[in-house]
Amino acid sequence: RLDSIYDNPEDDDPDVEVELMKRGINITLGSNDLFGSGSATLSRKGRGIVEEITATLTDIVSDYHLTMDVEGHTDDVPIRSFRFPSNWELSASRAANVVRKMTESGGIPKEQSRAIGFADMRPKIEPRDSTGALVRGARDANRRVEIIIHY
């Protein structure tokens, strides 16, 4: 069952990356498919992606008593709305909504799950080069949710 996580997820969705790390398994989801701009509500496609990942991970996390962190990351464009005064709130809310979806209906155990918001503090790609120019594709890459299954 664990092998199914590695079976070319990029073939199904180019915004899903799976990587084996020292700390565990890291699944990176591009947030453009998960959420609308400035929103923390999972889109229909986002719900489907999260449900599929949950179906694959539930037995692994439960049977082996592993822990799961869901990290929300944003780009460096500030958000200022009533609901999200900054990217901190947006990233935390996105992570929480993914955890909620993964733990509802007896999925991943709640007590083995954490939601963490990083805003734009841990970019996958630095948004600007040494001259201060925007790096093409950096903002898209930095808007993401990472699911880390700790060994």
Regions found by a protein language model. Name each.
Residues 28, 34-52, 56, 73-151:
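Periplasmic OmpA-like peptidoglycan-binding domain that tethers envelope proteins to the cell wall
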